[in-house]
């Protein structure tokens, strides 16, 4: 997940620009009623990466390419998703920012307030996953960050458990896109999961980010899938299409996810290089259809 300006700000601009792009949907993609997928992967998409399509344009088109959910949507836009019978596969709105997260205790009071307000809304809307971030290191060592994250997350964990909501911390690379981010290695995130020891706290395993920071994707999934509650895709390098110009071999990775018994969502978070965003999304779905 990479965004500049902030993903939330970019998404607001995308929504506001929707009316001006009203005719784009009909130009971008013709529905394919004959599309047949194996159905082993539940596909989602991150709306910010498909701009300039508005959220409504995205909702109206994604089912035609086998996508039934959208990530990183806040309560203000849930009704729009429901209008098109699109699931919110990862809710947001409680986080402060990627840089300001649970690893710093001075953010705990605000985070606790935000998540305690959001969690009941997520359950009421019929959703399950809520995004969370570790925050940046700012000179902090791994152990201090783990202890602080455990303290902060446990303040909201009982409410998440009560409402059947899963707090999902994203693994992001710190080499290229998110310099200084603390939860940048799967081992660190897995250790946090072990300390929290709840089925209501998981990791968002972003395949693109972990390819950059550590590689060994399939082995990591096979050995640690019980800690992963959600997945993201994108091509590397460049964070673009899942095509032959990038290095990640997605079909066997998807097979490892299927073999693990995972029944959550794999959401595509790449920035299409071409103008036809929906066609690029459809191609990604077919690449990952195992």
Language-model segments: which ranges?
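Active-site-proximal loop/turn and secondary-structure-junction residues that shape catalytic pockets
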Residues: 49-51, 74-76, 94-96, 136-138, ...
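Active-site-adjacent beta->alpha loops and helix N-cap segments on the catalytic face
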Residues: 78-82
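N-terminal small/glycine-rich loop or linker at the start of catalytic domains
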Residues: 34-46, 90-101, 135-137
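Mid-chain, structured segments of secreted extracytoplasmic proteins
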Residues: 86-115
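Catalytic domains of carbohydrate-active enzymes, especially glycoside hydrolases
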Residues: 58-77
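Histidine-acidic metal/acid-base catalytic patches
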Residues: 2-42, 47-63, 126-129, 183-205, ...
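Active-site acidic/histidine proton-transfer and metal-coordination neighborhood
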Residues: 14-16, 23-26, 37, 104-202, ...
């Amino acid at each position: 997940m990479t965004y500049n300006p902030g993903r939330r700000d970019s998404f607001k601009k995308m929504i506001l620009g929707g009316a001006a792009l009203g005719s784009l949907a009909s130009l971008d993609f013709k529905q394919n009623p004959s599309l047949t997928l194996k159905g082993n992967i539940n596909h989602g998409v991150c709306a910010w990466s498909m701009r300039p399509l508005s959220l409504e344009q995205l909702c109206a088109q994604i089912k035609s390419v086998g996508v039934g959910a959208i990530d990183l949507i806040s309560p203000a836009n849930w009704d729009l998703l429901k209008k098109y019978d699109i699931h919110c596969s990862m809710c947001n709105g409680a986080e402060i920012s990627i840089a300001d997260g649970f690893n710093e205790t001075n953010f705990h009071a605000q985070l606790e307030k935000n998540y305690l307000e959001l969690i009941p809304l997520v359950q009421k809307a019929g959703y399950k996953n809520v995004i969370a971030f570790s925050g940046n290191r700012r000179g902090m060592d791994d152990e201090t960050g783990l202890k602080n994250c455990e303290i902060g997350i446990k303040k909201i964990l009982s409410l998440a458990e009560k409402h059947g909501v899963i707090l999902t911390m994203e693994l992001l690379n710190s080499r290229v896109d998110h310099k200084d981010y603390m939860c940048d290695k799967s081992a660190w995130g897995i250790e946090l999961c072990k300390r929290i020891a709840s089925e209501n706290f998981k990791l968002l395993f972003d395949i693109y980010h972990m390819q950059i920071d550590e590689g060994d994707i399939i082995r990591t999934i096979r050995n640690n899938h019980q800690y992963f509650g959600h997945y993201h895709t994108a091509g590397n390098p460049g964070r673009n299409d899942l095509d032959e110009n990038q290095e990640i071999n997605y079909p066997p990775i998807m097979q490892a996810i299927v073999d693990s018994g995972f029944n959550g969502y794999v959401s595509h978070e790449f920035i299409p290089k071409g103008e036809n965003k929906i066609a690029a999304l459809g191609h990604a779905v077919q690449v990952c259809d195992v």
